[in-house]
């Protein structure tokens, strides 16, 4: 609404096309995903539709607010689903159970549980940002999003907790394989691997790190890390 006020009487041909593709998969997903277009002027929609039909098979017209919420909901939905897995992983961790085993048995012959994803680091420049944007849009009443962030952001602490259960862990070489927020990218924004790395440094541990997409002066090869790491 603030942007609409700023642009009022300045550009009636403004069209908003929210981006919903997975990072590093744009050339694969752009031709497959429906393209949402939001605007107030019919002629602007028709001209933008003509453009996007060159790369998209389906065009869906919405209001600007609908388009923005669809984008935010898409990422918040994924972020919350990952938080469910991470919360269940946390419960297993606190009870000395193997979450992967529990999850596999849950899903064995039981199709209704197949939507439960693996646990793990959930971050990056989109999922967290859009979930928090919804929180601020709702004047901090998006409690589910806040709870999801609390769960997901705590996973590095659980790893530290598991590490401390190893005998003489302070004398071990700790290998951290992967520094970016996800695989096949050099993007470290909001990466929980970096959060974990900083926590390990504060413990004054011997740390080895490797990421084939994100090179640092302290980085070594994946093979060398695996060969030299104790944990």
Ranges and model annotations:
Residues 1-231:
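Structural/interface elements that position substrates and couple domains in central-metabolism enzymes
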């Amino acid at each position: 609404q603030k942007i609409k006020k700023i642009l009022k009487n300045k550009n009636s041909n403004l069209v908003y096309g929210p981006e919903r593709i997975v990072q590093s998969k744009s050339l694969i997903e752009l031709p497959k995903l429906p393209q949402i277009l939001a605007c107030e002027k019919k002629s602007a929609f028709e001209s933008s539709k003509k453009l996007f039909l060159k790369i998209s098979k389906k065009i869906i017209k919405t209001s600007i607010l609908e388009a923005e919420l669809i984008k935010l909901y898409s990422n918040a939905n994924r972020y919350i689903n990952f938080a469910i897995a991470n919360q269940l992983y946390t419960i297993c961790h606190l009870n000395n159970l193997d979450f992967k085993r529990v999850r596999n048995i849950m899903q064995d012959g039981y199709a209704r549980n197949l939507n439960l994803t693996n646990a793990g680091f959930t971050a990056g420049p989109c999922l967290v940002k859009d979930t928090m944007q919804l929180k601020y849009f709702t004047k901090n009443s998006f409690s589910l999003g806040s709870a999801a962030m609390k769960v997901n952001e705590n996973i590095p602490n659980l790893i530290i907790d598991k590490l401390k259960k190893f005998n003489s862990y302070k004398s071990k070489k700790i290998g951290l394989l992967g520094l970016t927020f996800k695989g096949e990218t050099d993007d470290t924004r909001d990466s929980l691997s970096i959060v974990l790395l900083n926590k390990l440094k504060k413990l004054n541990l011997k740390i080895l790190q490797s990421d084939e997409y994100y090179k640092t002066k302290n980085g070594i090869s994946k093979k060398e890390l695996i060969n030299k790491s104790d944990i």
